[in-house]
A protein has these predicted regions:
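Terminal or standalone catalytic/regulatory effector modules within metabolic enzymes
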Residues: 2-127
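Mixed-charge, glycine-accented linear interaction segment located at domain edges/termini
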Residues: 124-158
Length: 158
């Protein structure tokens, strides 16, 4: 399933939630619909599907330390690419994959909130020349984060 846009409508429970400060400053006076139009998933050259990760390697009594292997299929325009990296988590893995395929984006801020049955992710990213906020949501927290990162990459690299 592509991470171009969310498959479900934005969670209405988020309307009452406080936005991260930087995004709140940029969107002062805007309706929730306007915030989503400006920062939600958009059409762009980058799409993501087929996300997989391996189990973490256990190191002693701290199983969360170490890297996992992540695999994804990236669609950049009409070009389909397979990517594979080892990283500490899914956002680190995706940003490394994006960099390797010409979408340099660094996550400056990351915020997640529960909104009913959905998780909403707000990311602030930069490619070194411009910075943008993006929003993604999904019933799975990892998928929500990946959607937000893809939306951010499409924005900063536009």
């Amino acid at each position: 399933m592509p991470y171009l846009a969310s498959t479900t409508p934005p969670p209405s429970t988020l309307v009452d939630a406080a936005l991260p400060r930087g995004l709140r400053d940029r969107t002062a006076g805007m309706s929730w619909e306007a915030v989503l139009a400006a920062h939600g998933p958009t059409v762009g050259p980058l799409r993501l599907s087929g996300w997989k990760s391996s189990e973490p390697r256990h190191q002693g009594r701290r199983p969360w330390l170490g890297h996992r292997k992540f695999q994804a299929t990236l669609a950049i325009g009409d070009l389909i690419c397979n990517a594979s990296v080892a990283a500490g988590g899914p956002v680190a893995a995706l940003t490394e994959m994006l960099y390797e395929h010409g979408f340099p984006v660094e996550m400056l801020e990351f915020h997640q909130r529960d909104a009913g049955t959905q998780t909403v992710t707000f990311v602030h990213g930069s490619n070194g020349l411009r910075d943008e906020w993006a929003v993604g949501w999904d019933s799975d927290a990892t998928q929500s984060a990946l959607r937000a990162v893809v939306a951010c990459a499409n924005r900063v690299c536009a």
